[in-house]
Amino acid sequence: MAAQTTEKLDQLDLNVQAAPTADQVPAEAEEDSDDAQDEGAAEAGAAGAGSTLADKKKKKKKPKKKSKKKGGAKVQSEPPRVPVSNLFPNGQYPEGEIVEYLNDNAYRTTNEEKRYLDRMNNDFLQEYRQGAEVHRQVRQYAQKNIKPGQTLTEIAEGIEDSVRALTGHSGLEEGDNIKGGMGFPCGLSINHCAAHYTPNAGNKMVLNEGDVMKVDFGAHLNGRIVDSAFTMTFDPVYDPLLAAVKDATNTGIREAGIDVRMSDIGAAIQEAMESYEVEINGTMHPVKCIRNLNGHNIDQHVIHGGKSVPIVKSTDQTKMEEGEVFAIETFGSTGKGYVREEMETSHYALAADAPNVPLRLSSAKNLLNLINKNFGTLPFCRRYIDRLGQDKYLLGLNNLVSSGIVQDYPPLCDIKGSYTAQYEHVCFYFGVFSTLIVY
């Protein structure tokens, strides 16, 4: 999911066709050639007519029609609805952007034993790559088609329906969403709201021309969550803000790696981010890191795995380890650079250390059963409960939250009037390709 506070811890070208080979000459050219040969044969036949059977006029050959290949190249629809497994029938998905290890980690490129052990992780990586391809195609469509005037509900449901279609998991059958689909709700946080906002049922909020919207969503296969985010604006005045945060995220990706300390990553991110400023309505604003938001590691079916990647200088001496998956994300703000919980809650998840407490409300018991069977430890929102046909569940949900069984994640906001931006990618730290793999 998009963010973790310290307090709580171009479009793929699928249309490429093979270049024409010599036997793929246009039908018209073939017919002209055959016609010329047949005319010559007819003249020779006339000169020796009646002599022998071999001298008889040759029959005019009909040009063979080239049989068309069945199926053709499969392409993605608009909106995206073709499962990526249909687009990549061999099950081999793009690797993503690769960044070579440097310095002391360069040995991973040549170590034969490391390469052998890494190949054993191929199934694990293919699940991540499939989810990454889903995310790439959906976000590319979203970036082209999100426009001012659309409601947030329309935008969120459009993204979520696309993810479900491309993973091949609608999430309507019991347990289906645990197998694949949405890794967490689609966050659409606007302006001073930095993270964890998605519309609840009945929300009428509309995206405006002057808004700065963070789009943060996850796709997963078998619990391998691909968590990536970007920021959309429609006014170039905000370009320096977006450039600052994008630069900071890319810096974090470059600095991260096996055995690197979190404090070093955070210091590099802060230096990159806070070298920018943005002018809004005649006032210069320094871009600040939102110091109580962090990146995080990701475990199977668990979006926040327990480790945090700070985006400011810190004393955290924790190291990244081989085999870990991290969401490297940064947040920049024109405000105070500190977020608090505000607005109506929409995001929830089963608490990792949920207590075993008796539930007296039948609505709470029924809802907990539904959550366990349909979401497990994956985050969900109220709209996801709605689409499963549930109603009048809010009392039970609040009871689960107050009992500590379900954790709520309210929207995280800087001061009103400020603007925030976010960029995020998932990174894998394996000797598997002796690289850092960025989605």
From Swiss-Prot:
Tell me the cofactors it needs: Co(2+); Zn(2+); Mn(2+); Fe(2+)
Name one molecular function that GO assigns to this entry: metal ion binding
The UniProt record gives the binding positions of a divalent metal cation 2 as 227, 296, 329, 424
Question: Where a divalent metal cation 1 is bound, by residue?
Answer: 216, 227, 424
* Matching PROSITE patterns: MAP_2 (PS01202)
| Residues the entry annotates as binding substrate | 196, 304
Q: Which GO terms describe its biological process?
A: proteolysis
Q: Name the UniProt key words of this record, in alphabetical order.
A: Aminopeptidase, Cytoplasm, Hydrolase, Metal-binding, Protease
Q: Compositionally biased, Acidic residues: which spans?
A: 28-41
UniProt remark on cofactor binding = Binds 2 divalent metal cations per subunit. Has a high-affinity and a low affinity metal-binding site. The true nature of the physiological cofactor is under debate. The enzyme is active with cobalt, zinc, manganese or divalent iron ions. Most likely, methionine aminopeptidases function as mononuclear Fe(2+)-metalloproteases under physiological conditions, and the catalytically relevant metal-binding site has been assigned to the histidine-containing high-affinity site.
Q: Where is this region: Disordered?
A: 1-90
Question: Principal localization?
Answer: cytoplasm
From the UniProt record, list the reaction(s) this protein catalyses.
Release of N-terminal amino acids, preferentially methionine, from peptides and arylamides
The Enzyme Commission number assigned here is: 3.4.11.18
Protein's cellular compartments: Cytoplasm
| Basic residues composition-biased segments | 56-72
The Gene Ontology CC terms held by the record are: cytoplasm
Tell me which family the UniProt entry assigns to this protein. Belongs to the peptidase M24A family. Methionine aminopeptidase eukaryotic type 2 subfamily.
Read off the NCBIfam families from this record. met_pdase_II (TIGR00501)
Q: Which PANTHER family match?
A: METHIONINE AMINOPEPTIDASE 2
User: What does the protein in this record do?
Assistant: Cotranslationally removes the N-terminal methionine from nascent proteins. The N-terminal methionine is often cleaved when the second residue in the primary sequence is small and uncharged (Met-Ala-, Cys, Gly, Pro, Ser, Thr, or Val).
* Record protein name field: Methionine aminopeptidase 2-2
